[in-house]
Amino acid sequence: MAAPKKVCIIGSGNWGSAIAKIVGANAAQNSKFDKTVKMWVFEETVNGRKLTEIINTEHENVKYLPGHKLPTNVLAVPDLVEASKDADILVFVIPHQFIGKVCDTMSGNIKKEAIGISLIKGVDEGPDGLKLISDVIQEKLGITMSVLMGANIANEVADEKFCETTIGCKNKSHGPLLKELMQTINFRVTVVEEYDVVEICGALKNIVAVGAGFCDGLGFGDNTKAAVIRLGLMEMIAFARIFCTAGPVSSATFLESCGVADLITTCYGGRNRKVAKAFVKTGKSIEELEKEMLEGQKLQGPATAAEVYRILKHKNLIDKFPLFNAVYQICYQGHPVSEFISCLQNHPEHM
């Protein structure tokens, strides 16, 4: 009998805590996993107490997932190396802006044969353009990565409301174990091999959701939002066909939870849409609204739009992605939000 696998969750925000609820419960009842699940918590003080202390005594992340009890076998650890050094499975769930620094701290301090799964929605820039977050982790830590993406608004997952998700595996032999770690009766997992397409969907849909929020802020209706979703999906597929080079890009992957389902839920719920709507209504900057509305959580859509803009500019492809470009120009270049509607009206799909 193989020794039970030790699991560490890197991150403890809204999504990290929701996943800790699932992983903790599954590890507690499956002999393939060690009963204790460590969760690295970036230490902060909440009402005069350390967040790790609150989580370990009251079993609740009162800052990022209030009102939900975490399993008692989830142990909050403030030291990243201490949390991750013995893990066989590393679950990455932090804002994509922090991944480089986190991996640098872990480098040389983890098991060589560990495997990783990234739940991080975003992309990085490499010297030749696009770099996937899972590739950044793989290069820095030398471990084989998978990814998990889907229509998974964290609070609904924590409420155990039914949803689906997609795991993309670079090494398909890791799929069954990761599925056992993640799947519950209300969190259904499909495993596919196109890990790069799964991951790119998770990043790009946040840009489209910003556009959906602009439409809401301008008072347009569901027909307009449906057009944003459709045109956004077309740009996501076109982008994947250019930049996902690990293998063929099949349309079927976009019909998984990581694709069209995640795009829909994010364009109707989710923080990117909410903040983009407020951006139109208040005239405040994205940075101001992030501080005011998200209580320490990070917004992924505008930052991803900026990275994608630079990648497309580098490849001379900006004209082929007018929706992505418009979101960037409005968020960062002071262009009027009304430009977003003309971007839809004049989209090359209609020419």
From Swiss-Prot:
GO terms for molecular function: glycerol-3-phosphate dehydrogenase (NAD+) activity; NAD binding; protein homodimerization activity. GO terms for cellular component: cytosol. Keywords: Cytoplasm, NAD, Oxidoreductase. One of its GO terms (biological process) is carbohydrate metabolic process. Pfam families: NAD_Gly3P_dh_C (PF07479), NAD_Gly3P_dh_N (PF01210). The keyword rRNA processing does not apply. It is found in: Cytoplasm. NAD(+) binds at G11, S12, G13, N14, W15, G16, K121, A154, R271, K298, Q300. PROSITE patterns: NAD_G3PDH. The keyword Heme does not apply. Belongs to the NAD-dependent glycerol-3-phosphate dehydrogenase family. Has glycerol-3-phosphate dehydrogenase activity. PANTHER family: GLYCEROL-3-PHOSPHATE DEHYDROGENASE, GLYCEROL-3-PHOSPHATE DEHYDROGENASE [NAD(+)], CYTOPLASMIC. NCBIfam families: glycerol3P_DH (TIGR03376). This is Glycerol-3-phosphate dehydrogenase [NAD(+)], cytoplasmic. It comes from Takifugu rubripes (Japanese pufferfish). The gene is gpd1.
